Amino acid sequence: MITRDFLMNADCKTAFGAIEESLLWSAEQRAASLAATLACRPDEGPVWIFGYGSLMWNPALEFTESCTGTLVGWHRAFCLRLTAGRGTAHQPGRMLALKEGGRTTGVAYRLPEETLLWKREMITGCYLPTWCQLDLDDGRTVNAIVFIMDPRHPEYESDTRAQVIAPLIAAASGPLGTNAQYLFSLEQELIKLGMQDDGLNELLVSVKKLLAENYPDGVLRPGFA
């Protein structure tokens, strides 16, 4: 599992598995992206980020406040080819991002600093950090940084049908564990928070069926939870 100490000390070239050198962003590129994002800040209020995937259950960041909320206009989609972390170039999986349309519930965090966040999320620059309005469940509306999939990125995948991506997620694994573990952690966190994402239902059923067929005795690969 990713921790704050892991992120602080991680060498991005090796810590998450083998990443194609042409895709890997340097510390300078990440710093420039962060500066450009903050320069577009729509107000002088605190900096919030919106977690819709692993940021929900394992932010690995210091934050001063958190609150559940809803992002309108975007929906979860496993549209990022996963070749590190929980997948490899030879056995790629799929990672979560956001695509236009619909709505997404998640967790917003108010951050005291953002540098480590960029190291966590922007290793290959696959996202477009975008300021969006969030409707928090306590009644507030805040501007937050949301990591939206960049469709121009080489690892963007447009086909997110369950029958296409379920076999990939069921099979992929890497230094951080299995791809299925990520999907099931998302399912558990949504249940814990009383949230529902109907777009995940078919995918969850398909991945669980594939794992049951491949591991009939319930013996799963290391890292599965």
PLM features: residue spans?
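A glycine-rich, hydrophobic/aromatic-adjacent loop/helix-cap motif
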Residues: 1-225
